[in-house]
């Protein structure tokens, strides 16, 4: 479950713990704790179902809504975030589930490299899509004249393309670091492991991944959200010159209802800001802390159950992403309720008031303003 492995030390990205290279043939067999293996499989299965189901539902709701009109900019980002998280489920969690079940990677060298590459693509894409979405919200609020200059409502806009391009590019080292290698000095037992030219290569690479996948996006997201909050706060609290102008005119600019609407919008933005940053840090921090610990400390408890289970939580953020943005988007949450309502109708094969409620929900969404 470590990010990378050498043939003499630690297991590979999301691979089960393996024996060191000087082990005998008997020791290279699967001697893992059966209870721990079952716990790993149960945890990975739960994460896979949660990621696939939640992102599939939200993506289905967005596609259903998009068929009836132009895609809103926020919906474009949420849909690509769902795609990135589905890539995490299919190319990261599912291979790890099979890997944990068999203890060794069973497949050719090309498949080993492809799996490792796609695992990292999913991690980068999920983080960078959130960062791209936050940058777009910052531009829309703080630089509104530039918000839609580059095709904000298109299904593929510039921030989305940049996020995918960086994810594909930064994952390329995986193709050269990992390969099917003998884990026991001629034992004939092979696993998908990494090899570095220098002893410090493992520490440098794990630290680089932690910075690029977790630290840098987290700082960027937090900075953008602070700037968004400051911009909204500045629009609500007039400066000295604006207050003087209002006194000279002898009247207020704007109605109480308009001010209340802006205050509600700011409160919603602040809540979303806190949720995004806190959940992002809480989901990624345990995983990368144990990764860095394992890379920098030769005495790290690699096979202790808490340590092993924490290494499986790289995809935890993909479980929460769709629900965070769906809950703060009235149009997405309404479409999701309508989709679930109609799915229940088809499941029960019932006609009558339930059909009418589905139709009413769908028609009302046509007038819903994207948020």
Curated annotation (Swiss-Prot):
Segments on the Extracellular side according to the record's topology features: 1-38, 99-113, 181-200, 294-308
Stored InterPro entries: GPCR_Rhodpsn, GPCR_Rhodpsn_7TM, Vasoprsn_rcpt, Vprsn_rcpt_V2
GO molecular function: peptide hormone binding; signaling receptor activity; vasopressin receptor activity
GO biological process, one term: cellular response to hormone stimulus
Family per similarity comment: Belongs to the G-protein coupled receptor 1 family. Vasopressin/oxytocin receptor subfamily.
Location relative to the cell: Cell membrane
Positions bearing carbohydrate: 22, 185
Record carries keyword Transmembrane helix: yes
GO cellular component: endocytic vesicle; endosome; perinuclear region of cytoplasm; plasma membrane
Species the sequence originates in: Rattus norvegicus
Polar residues biased stretches: 357-371
Name assigned to this protein: Vasopressin V2 receptor
Complexes and interactors: Interacts with ARRDC4. Identified in a complex containing at least ARRDC4, V2R and HGS. Interacts with TMEM147.
Described purpose of this protein according to its UniProt entry: Receptor for arginine vasopressin. The activity of this receptor is mediated by G proteins which activate adenylate cyclase. Involved in renal water reabsorption.
Tissue: Kidney.
Residues spanning the membrane: 39-63, 78-98, 114-135, 160-180, 201-220, 272-293, 309-328
Keywords attached to this entry: Cell membrane, G-protein coupled receptor, Glycoprotein, Lipoprotein, Membrane, Palmitate, Receptor, Transducer, Transmembrane, Transmembrane helix
